[in-house]
């Protein structure tokens, strides 16, 4: 269900804003998007896994809050991020 550490490190390298960046909104949103995608695949197979579904909804909410924060702070970075991640908003 969870993404591997290697995949997480790839996402951090791709979306970081500077060399030691692991906590910028872009990185957090990219990691959450990968986790949401993986959990979505799990839930397609295990339809009655309501515990994981609740976790998915919490992740989607956290990502939405981060996206709203980024949109309010820097619209250009926000637009580039949703385009590169393929998020509909």
UniProtKB/Swiss-Prot annotation:
Pfam families: Ribosomal_S15. Keywords: Ribonucleoprotein, Ribosomal protein, RNA-binding, rRNA-binding. GO terms for cellular component: cytosolic small ribosomal subunit. It comes from the Bacteria. Belongs to the universal ribosomal protein uS15 family. One of the primary rRNA binding proteins, it binds directly to 16S rRNA where it helps nucleate assembly of the platform of the 30S subunit by binding and bridging several RNA helices of the 16S rRNA. HAMAP family: Ribosomal_uS15_B (MF_01343_B). This is Small ribosomal subunit protein uS15. It comes from Staphylococcus saprophyticus subsp. saprophyticus (strain ATCC 15305 / DSM 20229 / NCIMB 8711 / NCTC 7292 / S-41).
């Amino acid at each position: 269900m969870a993404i591997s550490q290697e995949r997480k490190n790839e996402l951090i390298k791709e979306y970081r804003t500077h060399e030691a960046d692991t906590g910028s909104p872009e990185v957090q949103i990219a990691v959450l998007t990968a986790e949401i995608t993986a959990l979505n695949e799990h839930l397609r197979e295990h339809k009655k896994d309501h515990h994981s579904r609740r976790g998915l909804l919490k992740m989607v909410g956290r990502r939405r809050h981060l996206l709203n924060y980024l949109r309010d702070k820097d619209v250009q970075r926000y637009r580039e991020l949703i385009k590169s991640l393929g998020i509909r908003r």
